[in-house]
Design a protein with these regions (language model features):
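A cross-domain feature marking catalytic cores of carbohydrate-active enzymes
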Residues: 1, 5, 87-89, 114-116
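Short linear motifs at secondary-structure transitions and domain/linker junctions
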Residues: 30-34, 40-42, 87-90, 110-111, ...
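The start of beta-strands in P-loop NTPase/AAA+ ATPase cores
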Residues: 79-81, 110
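An alpha-helix initiation/capping motif
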Residues: 89-97
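Substrate-binding/active-site clefts of carbohydrate-active enzymes
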Residues: 1-72, 77, 102-105, 122-123
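Conserved alpha/beta catalytic core and glycan-binding cleft of carbohydrate-active enzymes
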Residues: 6-19, 45, 71-72, 96, ...
C-alpha cells in the first residue's frame, strides 16, 4: 500500500522522537499545532480516519524516491513485472503519473492495476496512468445478474461508465 504506513514505520518513529527536527516530518501530513489520539505531541492525518495508519505525503519527492527504490529492488530481486495498488482511489493522481513514468522506465511491459472501489474509473486508467483497475461496481452488477437474474445493476453500471453509444469501449483507442 503506497499511501499509508503503520505507526511503527521507521520514518514516522523518527518524527515521534525528534518532532520538528526530524528530516522526515514532511513525509507525512503533520501539524504541530495539535495532538493525535495517541498523544504524540502533534496531529497527523490517518488513512480514512484510521490513525494507526499514517498517511504519506505522496507529493514529497523523497517519499516518491523511497517508494520507487523499493519497486526497483523488488523488480531486481524478485523479478516482479507489475503491481496491484491497494486503495488506488486514495492515491494522488500526480503520484500515479509519476509512478507510471518510473515503472515504464523500468520496463515497457511493467503493468499497474489499481483497486478502485467507486468513482470514475476513467480518471485513473489510461495513457500515463494505471493500465487497468478493479471494477467492483460492474462486479456487483454481474454477480446480481448471474445469481438473481437482475440485469438492472449491470445495465446501470455499464451505461454510467461507458455511455449509451455503440462501441464506446473503443473510443480513442484506434
Amino acid at each position: 500500500v503506497f499511501n499509508h504506513v503503520g505507526r511503527g514505520f521507521w520514518a514516522f518513529k523518527d518524527v515521534q522522537e525528534k518532532k520538528w527536527d526530524s528530516p522526515y516530518k514532511d513525509w507525512f501530513h503533520i501539524s504541530f499545532d495539535g495532538n493525535s489520539n495517541y498523544n504524540d505531541g502533534f496531529w497527523y492525518e490517518g488513512w480514512e480516519g484510521h490513525f494507526e495508519l499514517v498517511k504519506l505525503n505522496l507529493r514529497h519527492p523523497d517519499v516518491q524516491h523511497h517508494i520507487f527504490d523499493c519497486i526497483r529492488q523488488w523488480k531486481d530481486e524478485f523479478g516482479i513485472d507489475g503491481l496491484r495498488l491497494d486503495v488506488a482511489y486514495c492515491l494522488d493522481k500526480n503520484f500515479i503519473r509519476a509512478l507510471r513514468g518510473f515503472c515504464d522506465s523500468l520496463s515497457p511491459d511493467f503493468f499497474l492495476v489499481g483497486e478502485l472501489l467507486h468513482g470514475d474509473y476513467n480518471q485513473f486508467v489510461g495513457d500515463g496512468m494505471l493500465h487497468s483497475c478493479t471494477n467492483y461496481e460492474c462486479y456487483k452488477g454481474l454477480y446480481s445478474s448471474m445469481n438473481s437474474y437482475n440485469l438492472f445493476e449491470i445495465t446501470h453500471s455499464l451505461l454510467r461508465q461507458f455511455g449509451p453509444e455503440n462501441w464506446t469501449l473503443y473510443k480513442g483507442k484506434h
